[in-house]
Amino acid sequence: MTSAPAAERPAAPAVPRIKWTVVEAVELFEQPFMDLLFRAQQVHRAHFDPNAVQRSTLLSIKTGGCSEDCGYCSQSTRHNTGLDREQLLKVAEVVEHAKAAKAKGASRFCMGAAWRGPKDKDMETVLAMVREVKALGLETCVTLGMLKGDQALQLKEAGLDYYNHNLDTAPEFYGQVITTHTLADRLDTLEQVRGAGINVCSGGIVGMGEGRRSRAGLLVQLANMASPPESVPINNLVPVPGTPLENVDKIDPFEFVRTIAAARIMMPTSFVRLSAGRQQMSDELQALCFMAGANSIFYGDRLLTTDNPDTDRDEALFARLGLRPV
């Protein structure tokens, strides 16, 4: 397996691996808030520059028409969200988006497709996208659903740096959100990605109605992998009208920060990414998340079908906080 790019390598030596239990993770969540943030910041400073944030840009290369029933997703054909199905983008169009992302300061370009998994007929186009984006000097990432056969090896040969496939939530809550594929299916794809020598990007979504134990359980699943993900995106649910989760109660903001802090402590050398939901966060809440150990964001005004802060707002926030790009 190839080593992670310099931007993703921790500055400090690797720490001994800890196998977490759900009980231990819950106890971590239950620490006094200030104690938890202090511990998370200590861990963060031991492995990363505390004032540096990695920036990724995410583009939907194929929108809508997905056969799966993920309860949070606007792109499922099983939900009445009013989203039209679109065809796979042309390679040249993707390259133009990637050039714009690089010009604005992104170091990684992520490409997402709404389907259960890529069909063979679409793979050559996706592989060409990876090769062309890589040639721009950007790190490449794709999120294509479940892989089969030698697709992971094909992506590796094309130059793919990262593959995103989130676990979404804890095992005991998973069936309340998704029924068309299992958590085991997701883990199988991640094993294929690891086996091909591609860096793993995997995290989850909070605020879907799960309890603290399930949030802790998600992090345990991630932290206890043979090799924890190099990138761990933590999404704060953005309820979409027409989906089963459109009326779910919002997670308490401090509980979201606790989740970030626990992720940092449990996966000390992983990049922890603030993902979906930043548009709804105040600058102050985001600052707390950075204090808790988040050191990566999605950069740009769109995340697949969800709004994201525009780059001007992010640049203003980074200036106020003294944060700089990786």
Swiss-Prot record:
It is an enzyme of class 2 (transferase). Pfam families: BATS, Radical_SAM. Its EC number is 2.8.1.6. The keyword Iron applies. [2Fe-2S] cluster binds at residues 110, 141, 201, 273. Transmembrane segments: none annotated. GO terms for biological process: biotin biosynthetic process. Keywords: 2Fe-2S, 4Fe-4S, Biotin biosynthesis, Iron, Iron-sulfur, Metal-binding, S-adenosyl-L-methionine, Transferase. Belongs to the radical SAM superfamily. Biotin synthase family. PANTHER family: BIOTIN SYNTHASE, BIOTIN SYNTHASE, MITOCHONDRIAL. Catalyzes the conversion of dethiobiotin (DTB) to biotin by the insertion of a sulfur atom into dethiobiotin via a radical-based mechanism. This is Biotin synthase. It comes from Aromatoleum aromaticum (strain DSM 19018 / LMG 30748 / EbN1). The lineage of its organism: Bacteria, Pseudomonadati, Pseudomonadota, Betaproteobacteria, Rhodocyclales. The gene is bioB.
